[in-house]
Design a protein with these regions (language model features):
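Structural beta-sheet core signal
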Residues: 5, 51, 103, 128-131, ...
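Conserved beta-loop-beta/alpha segment of the NTase-like Rossmann-fold superfamily
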Residues: 60-148, 183-185
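A structural signal for short hydrophobic beta-strand segments in well-ordered beta-sheet cores
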Residues: 25, 144-146, 197, 209, ...
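Phosphate-binding and adjacent anionic-ligand microenvironments
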Residues: 243-337
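Well-ordered alpha-helical segments embedded in enzymatic catalytic cores
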Residues: 33-36, 88-91, 196
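Catalytic-core segments of class I nucleotidyltransferases/pyrophosphorylases
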Residues: 100-102, 109, 115-122, 136-138, ...
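N-terminal glycine-rich phosphate-binding loop and ensuing alpha1 helix
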Residues: 1-61, 269
Length: 337
């Protein structure tokens, strides 16, 4: 079965995690995000994959090659100009070659049963089948309104509360039939949610929504990335760690000469390899701080232990560690973990 992996985004909202690397190469459990997606595809029978690239596409090609190390046949389509989500898929028409195709975004972590989504699409006869997920945070996402049979009647893009009529979130994972691809204009930017899906609905085409169980999270910001790391460590997200990613029960704590009130136990250093926060020098966080309000300066690594924070003394800025006055629990609580 064929799949298209959309991996052309720059990941500007995910900075500083994506400084110096494209978003698909940002690591989760010691393995690039795109590697986890390729493994998910392979597990569910999608072994023929085309990745759409734009920003630093050469880095991604060098990292994954022909895909054989990941158990798939991997090829690439490099965009010289942004084509949007649907336009980028249309650019892969030769790869699709008139078949049904799975579309998956490089912006999310999930462990969905993609084979079940494929079967639901084939059974429905729809032009497009959309993977839906119930969410308690509907304002952050595009929503799909379905009838009792699962047929999608409308889409609502990031609504405000008065317009929230469903909690079914569009996860950005689709199965497209050839007639859906035919409806995408070639050679220009075109978007699934804003253009293709409304056009298909207006023409009377059937779009099916399949509600999937399992984990799904958009990884668009450092906070969502950090939450995803915690979920993976605590078993809510099923991922296979990289070979070099391991933790010892005897993980050492912070050196005493940092002068901080720290207690780094268990998986603290492990979590430190996953998520770096950049916080102001000389700051007092006893009242808590939001991630978006932090200035980028000193490297602070949050601990997997909820009441502990570890300073990365290997950082070039480590000599400034004593200028910090931290209430460790306040920092963790401010992240709403």
């Amino acid at each position: 079965m064929k799949a298209i992996l959309m991996a052309g985004g720059e990941g500007t909202r995910l900075r500083p995690i994506t400084h110096g690397a494209p978003k698909p190469l940002a690591e989760l459990l010691g393995k690039p995000m795109m590697g986890h997606i390729l493994e998910l595809l392979r597990r569910h029978g999608f072994d023929d994959v085309c990745a759409t690239l734009r920003y630093r596409g050469g880095d991604i090609i060098r990292a994954f090659g022909d895909g054989s190390a990941w158990g798939v046949r991997l090829r690439y389509m490099l965009e010289t100009e942004p084509l949007g989500t649907a336009g980028g898929v249309k650019n892969c028409a030769d790869f699709i070659d008139g078949e049904d195709v799975l579309i998956i975004s490089g912006d999310a972590a999930c462990d969905f049963d993609l084979a079940a989504l494929w079967r639901a699409h084939r059974a429905s006869g729809a032009a497009v089948t959309v993977a839906l997920r119930r969410s308690s945070e509907p304002l952050r996402y595009g929503l799909a309104v379905t009838d009792e049979s699962g047929r999608i009647r409308s889409f609502i893009e990031k609504p405000d509360w008065p317009h929230v009529v469903t909690d079914f979130v569009n996860t950005g994972i689709y199965v497209l039939s050839p007639r859906a691809l035919d409806a995408i204009p070639a050679g220009r930017p075109y978007d699934f949610g804003r253009e293709l899906f409304p056009a298909l609905l207006a023409s009377g085409e059937v779009l099916h929504g399949e509600v999937l169980e399992g984990y799904w999270r958009d990884i668009g910001t450092p906070l969502s990335y950090y939450r995803c790391c915690v979920d993976a460590l605590e078993g809510r997200l099923q991922l296979t760690p990289g070979e070099a990613f391991a933790a010892s029960p005897e993980t050492p704590g912070c050196p005493e000469d940092t002068g901080l009130r720290c207690d780094c136990r268990d998986r603290a250093a492990l979590m430190g390899t996953l998520a770096e926060l950049f916080l102001p020098l000389g700051a007092d966080f006893s009242d808590g701080i939001g991630l978006e309000s932090a200035r980028f300066s000193l490297h602070i690594r949050p601990s997997a232990v909820r009441d502990a924070v570890c300073v990365d003394v290997r950082s070039p800025d480590a000599e400034f560690a004593k200028e910090l006055s931290l209430s460790a629990k306040a920092v963790i609580d401010a992240l709403n973990l």
